[in-house]
Amino acid sequence: MIIKNITIENFQSYYESQTMEFSKGLNLIIGNGGKGKSKLFNAFYWVLFGKIYITGIGWCTTDNLPQSAKFAMQRYEFINKRALFNAQINDKIRASVQIEIEDDKGNDYIIERSVSALRLEGEEWDSNDAWQVGGNMLKVSFDSTTGTKVLNDLLAEDKINELFPDGIRTVSYTHLTLP
């Protein structure tokens, strides 16, 4: 499996839309602490599996972020803070991650996961009551014998599981190994 590129929009530390192109062969992500390497890893994992890694908690789905006496994460917190701060009442902020991959047969796939948050009236921007956050939307597009095929939600998850079966998912917080 070859990852051709990733486009990240308003996801965690990534503000607005940013695209990274990857070349064939080995690609290294190197940088100082706090510069977005772990958030990039989260973007890959979120687009494929709908989860992000939270230190001290582990893998969590963004549709159900953890709430406990020791830790509370608001439903909107994986969306970029600058985008949320700049939003006006009734603005919709979209967070998304899209990857383009090529399988071993040369077939291209575009996988995209997105979520939208609507800015509500009457609360400070960083209040949980200030946002109405929708569920994750998942889409997989690829060419088929009948033209471009687009799969959504459960069918898209099935296609991702076909492309990345459990037996080849070697994932830890510090590295991502794809076939």
Please report, for each region that a protein language model flagged, where it lies by residue.
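Pre-Walker A-like glycine/lysine-rich segment at the N-terminus of P-loop NTPase domains
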Residues: 1-54, 59-67
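Short, hydrophobic/aromatic-rich segments at coil-to-beta transitions
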Residues: 4-6, 91-98
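Residue-level recognition of well-ordered beta-strand positions that form the cores
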Residues: 7, 98-102, 112-114
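Glycine-centered tight beta-turn/hairpin loop motif at sheet-sheet or coil-to-beta transitions
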Residues: 13, 104-106
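Intrinsic-disorder/low-complexity, polar/charged segments enriched in Ser/Thr/Lys/Arg/Asp/Glu/Gln
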Residues: 17, 94-96, 110
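Glycine-rich phosphate-binding loops of NTPases
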Residues: 60, 69-77, 81-84, 108-173
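A short catalytic or substrate-binding loop motif that flags glycine-/basic-rich loops and adjacent residues
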Residues: 87-94, 104
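Conserved small/polar residues in nucleotide/adenosyl-binding loops
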Residues: 174-179
